[in-house]
Amino acid sequence: MSRLAEAWRVLTARDASLNSLLGDRARYRQSSAPVVTQESALRNSVWWAGSVLRANLVSTFPVDVVRRVGALDVPVPSPGQFIAEPFPDVSSNEFRFSTQMDKDRYGNAVGIIRERTVKGDYPMAVELQNMSTVSAVMDGGKIVQWRCGRDYYAPRDIWHEKQYTISGLALGLNPLTYAARDLGIYESASDWALDWFAGGALPRVTLKNTQPDKIGPENAQEARDKFRESTRGGDIFVHGVEWEWTPATTSAATSGFLEQQESSEQAICRFIGVPAMMVGVDGGTGNITYANVTQANLQFLIMNLGPSVIRLEEYWSRKALPKPWHVKLNTDALLRLDPQGKADLMVKLNAMKVRTPTELRQLDNLGPYDADQIAEIGTFAALG
């Protein structure tokens, strides 16, 4: 019987379990692959290009502060410096680039709130942290404390953006971990279990005991069995009364997900959420064409980038602004037209009375017509 057939038989058995699928040999199988970090994952050029593309776009969208009045969003002056400069000498563009890169690599972006407004207690200065120095002290799926370097902080003193979330866990996941989690059934059916679950000898995430307790001889075997059980499946290893979540390093099994899946460059683009053609990869379909660059960008915005932008707007609005004010990222900047297309659109908007000439001129940083310009336009109209 082939390995695939045997895996399928065990999976469909009444009392099927992962242990019976792997067998005793897998229980003690060791991985010779090295532990890699999220930085080394960026060596993959397609992964790097996709991450940078997403971060570049999100960080350069113009930021507007608006107030909801009836059915309209009315622009209002920013209530403070935080929207334009979240930390001294750190612009909004730089801040958003860093947080987007961290979210795509770790699933989380963390900063320490160093200063708050006197009125409303909203953040005025947030110092982003290197994720390799960040830990989350947790009680079940709830964050009770953050550790940044050697210092501990209450959750209210932390700016925490996240993506790829799952129910019951207050932390986000990186795209590969999220994909690996949700592809479990497919992985087993394709004989993935024997390579994925048995091949990783290190935990995906380390949970460190923060108590000074020592393990005595009577508990050594129990601790050894627990460690072997967790690391065998690439799962989280829990030890001690209190523990800390550390996201900076992942096991070879997690970081090698693309290689184990024999993923193509197109698959990498699917994991990161970027159309293949935008990072120089052949899409492989051969039949998807766009009339212009704008249509391609629109598809990317709607299908890939838009949802994360909406979540970012919601978080910033909830954490940094009083109600009913909220943050809007002007995603129209992604849909910049070529000169001819822009001119045609302006003519149509004016003819359909959707925009006035003054509003359209503002898009080119031009003021309203002055008296001489109006007279000149009248002369041209008279000449036909």
Question: Model-derived features: where do they sit?
Answer:
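Structured, contiguous alpha/beta core segments that scaffold functional sites
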Residues: 1-257, 261-263, 267-270, 274, ...
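Divalent metal-cofactor coordination and adjacent catalytic microenvironments
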Residues: 100-108, 135, 299-334, 343, ...
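Short acidic alpha-helical/loop segments enriched in Asp/Glu that coordinate divalent cations
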Residues: 276-288, 314-323
